[in-house]
Amino acid sequence: HLVSGLFQTLGFAKEKIHVKTHTETYVSYVLCNKREIWANDVTLFRMDENEFICQNITKRRVKNGLVIFVEEENLTGRISYNMLKTKSGREQADDILLSYLQEDYKTHIVSCVFFTGIGFYDNWYRKSAAEICRRRKAFKGMNLFADGAAVSIQDEEYKDILILCEGKTLLNIGILIEKEGNEEEFSMLRAGQSWTES
């Protein structure tokens, strides 16, 4: 609310201000691509000086559309940015990532993998990339979140898609009220609604 309050103070209308998390912009970026990119699960590897994060998008078809789940795993304990400073560290990091991918692909069908962040400026992950590109598309880019934020304003286009991730409510939240002798559900928050906009 601090960010939206600041922009309101600067004269922007409240309904024109949208605060999005990295995860939300990542999902928006994936959804704006061709469906073949997100035909199956989609993985994002993000590394900066402080952390190495893996986010997986999975989806499930439901009666009224599509539910997208984003699961996040912190891999900083396995590979750190400091490992990439030496040749032997880069080789070790590639072996660790390759092992992680091989294990993950036993349970997930992944159609696309994205790499972003300063940790992926150099191509230290050659063996891992070869494994990924065997049956999947792979992209490396440094402006994925900015592009995702730009297209996220088109989220109305995806009104039949429910996105469940960190920063969004996972369930409908409501109360039962009595109105004219009948019980009715009064919705307070919908599943997939951003906490920052609640």
Predicted feature locations:
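Phosphate/oxyanion-binding active-site loops and adjacent basic polyanion-contact surfaces
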Residues: H1, V19-H22, K85-L97, G141-A146
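Glycine-rich phosphate-binding loops at beta-strand->alpha-helix junctions
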Residues: H1, Y100-A130, K137, G141-M142
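Nucleotide/phosphate-binding catalytic cleft detector across ATP-hydrolyzing
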Residues: H1-M47, I57, D95, C133-R134, ...
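Conserved beta-strand -> loop -> alpha-helix junction used to position metal-binding or nucleic-acid-contacting
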Residues: F12-V27, F69-G77, K137-V151
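Phosphate/ATP-binding catalytic cores across multiple sugar-kinase/actin-like superfamilies
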Residues: Y26-K34, E91-I109, S152
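A short acidic Gly-Thr/Ser loop motif
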Residues: E36-I53, I57-R60, G117-F120, L164-L171, ...
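Short glycine-rich, Thr/Ser-proximal phosphate-binding strand/loop in the N-terminal lobe
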Residues: N56-E91
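Acidic, glycine/GT-rich loop-and beta-edge segments that sit at the periphery of enzyme/chaperone cores
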Residues: L144, A150-S198
